[in-house]
Amino acid sequence: MMATERANRMKLDRVSEKRALVNNAILGLYDYGGTAVFNAVTEYNTETGGNYTPVTVMAPSVFREFMIWLASKIDYLRELMQDNGKMFHQDVTGKEVDRHTPMSRQKLFLHSAFEKYFRANCSNLFNPSYLPEFAAVESVAYWQNPQAPMDVQGTAKTIDSAGAVQTVTTALCEDVIGILFDDDFMGLSNISNWSAPEPYNARFGYQNTWYHSTYRSITDWSENSLLIRLA
């Protein structure tokens, strides 16, 4: 029982570190704006001449067509990310650099509700079995808070145009569908795990054991990444 509880707590620590890394990326991309963010409803309105909102686009009369369009658009954005270009990353110190990300190096973290919407409404377009070159589609039940599963709130560490680290404060990034990125864009490594027991407490008959983990993370803003929102 205690060993299981300890393992669960250590796993939760790792999950928390990963979630914090992804949320930092979401808030950073939201702050950069421009081509770092794809606002799906806005783009849908532009292409169709509609006047939908994140609420009205989910109405039964529109929902299926919008999901089919969105699945196709994400597929198109993945193709764009394969080509050398400057659209999906940040350039620093005044030097523009072309980047490309092959399908096999792309990852998509997708809100699980939308993964299920895609499968229900357009499985012939959005089906991992038809995407053998696509490295990973990972379903995420919530980004930060299960009570507001599509929202992220807080601060983020990014880089400015000179390449220096900066802290950005974003009150709230709402309606996050997913994040598409090069697998070099962000990563997390556990560089040290160790444990040691305290001396045995002879009076009360117990012994504490302390567990330590050290994580290091990286977010390379010069690599390709894209925030996808229902906005």
Which stretches of residues belong to each language-model region?
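Hydrophobic transmembrane signal anchors and adjacent membrane-proximal interface regions, especially
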Residues: 12-13, 27, 36-41, 52-60, ...
